[in-house]
Amino acid sequence: MPKMKTKKSAAKRFVVRPGGTVKRGQAFKRHILTKKTTKNKRHLRGSTAVHDADMNSVRAMLPFA
């Protein structure tokens, strides 16, 4: 059986909190910002939690987290 390895792209994008939830950054905040309203950009600040439907995929990508 091959070694389990962490997906490095996922390790750079996600942070596992002590309670077991996974933190991720918001999308749609990199470019093409002129057509987005200030309110929309403000709501995209900060981070949020990964949804329950995606947790199995994230856990598989981060086996040691």
Curated annotation (Swiss-Prot):
Keywords: Ribonucleoprotein, Ribosomal protein. Pfam families: Ribosomal_L35p. The keyword Ribonucleoprotein applies. GO terms for cellular component: cytosolic large ribosomal subunit. PROSITE patterns: RIBOSOMAL_L35. One of its GO terms (biological process) is translation. GO terms for molecular function: structural constituent of ribosome. The keyword Plastid does not apply. NCBIfam families: rpmI_bact. This is Large ribosomal subunit protein bL35. It comes from Paraburkholderia phytofirmans (strain DSM 17436 / LMG 22146 / PsJN). The gene is rpmI.
